[in-house]
Design a protein with these regions (language model features):
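Substrate-binding pocket helix/loop in short-chain dehydrogenase/reductase
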Residues: 107-109, 113-118, 162, 226
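The beta1-alpha1 cofactor-binding region of Rossmann-like NAD(H)/NADP(H)-dependent oxidoreductases
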Residues: 48-49, 70-82, 114, 239-240
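Catalytic loop of short-chain dehydrogenase/reductase
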Residues: 140, 149-187, 192-200
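Canonical Rossmann dinucleotide-binding motif of NAD(H)/NADP(H)-dependent dehydrogenases/reductases
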Residues: 9-42, 195
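A conserved structural motif in NAD(P)-dependent oxidoreductases
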Residues: 230-241, 252
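Short C-terminal tail/terminal secondary-structure segment
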Residues: 2-8, 103-106, 167, 246, ...
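Short, small/polar-rich loop/turn modules that mediate ligand/substrate recognition or access, typified
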Residues: 200, 205, 256-258
């Protein structure tokens, strides 16, 4: 039997990982997890001060190289500039995590304007397309293969239960899930499957992570109503999404592509 160091399969030392939406609630955890497993990390987000500060924090905490780059992923010129800058400062790109999220305020489907629809789709669809295209081209030119991971949502694979939003709020704002959010997150899964076969000969693997509801200052009413629908009986902690990312980013998943790992406490198993 071949002697395999199974722990080493998860080692990301020497790899460069790019994370969009890098200073968001999940983005920070994803960046930290990648850094802890040895990856050099590029934090991409639209918040200029936050990306630089968080990149410094990653370097101090984990001893890896980390840089912050301000980028609106829905802008073709900004995406091209960001990828060029990453290659200049970091060398090859081995991992892309398409994780930026556009989400408009909750609005009834009947009242949603085209402008509101496009605000979300510009990030969740066009942004994912632009980043995957630009980084995919770079990975092909490097001839080293690579791993692309894209964040979908539980509402990309099932309809939102409107009942759980009754009397619910988060950070003082009324909660709800818009149709465009569900529509775009479903499209992320389709893009993943397409690219997984399209780039298979280039040894670029493409997979999706689909998170369920993550605890983030929602009121107790929402937490209870959401948790009652979950077989495990609670909302997710943001840290619980990281294991799936490390698996998909690393050689531990070297024979996995085109897949969607659902981290939802069993919600879609009912």
């Amino acid at each position: 039997m071949k002697n395999v160091n199974y722990a080493k399969l998860f080692d990301l030392t020497g790899k460069t990982a790019v994370v969009t939406g890098g200073v968001g609630i999940l983005g920070k955890c994803f960046c930290s997890g990648l850094a802890e497993f040895g990856a050099n990390v590029v934090v991409l987000d639209i918040d200029e001060n936050a990306v630089f500060e968080f990149a410094k924090e990653l370097t101090t905490t984990y001893g890896v190289k980390a840089i912050g780059i301000t980028c609106d992923t829905s802008s073709p010129s900004e995406v091209r500039h960001a990828v060029k800058l990453i290659v200049k400062k970091m060398g090859a790109i081995h991992i892309l995590h398409n994780n930026a999220q556009g989400k408009t305020a909750s609005v009834n489907f009947e009242d949603c304007s085209l402008e509101q629809w496009r605000m979300t789709s510009s990030v969740n669809e066009e942004g994912y397309f632009l980043m995957a295209q630009a980084v995919g081209k770079q990975m092909i030119s490097q001839n080293l293969g690579g791993s692309i991971i894209q964040t979908s949502s539980i509402y990309g694979i099932m309809g939102a239960d409107q009942r759980i939003y009754k009397n619910s709020s988060s950070k003082g704002k009324t909660m709800g899930t818009s149709a465009v959010y569900s529509f775009t997150k479903s499209g992320v899964i389709g893009l993943t499957k397409y690219l997984a076969t399209y780039w298979a000969n280039n040894k670029i693997r493409v997979n999706t992570i689909t998170p369920g509801g993550v605890e983030d200052e929602q009121n107790e009413t929402f937490k209870k109503q959401y948790s009652n629908r979950i077989p495990l009986g609670r909302m997710a902690l943001k840290e619980e999404m990281v294991g799936a990312l490390i698996y998909l980013a690393s050689d531990a998943s070297s024979y996995v592509t085109g897949q969607n790992i659902i981290v939802d406490g069993g919600l879609d198993a009912w």
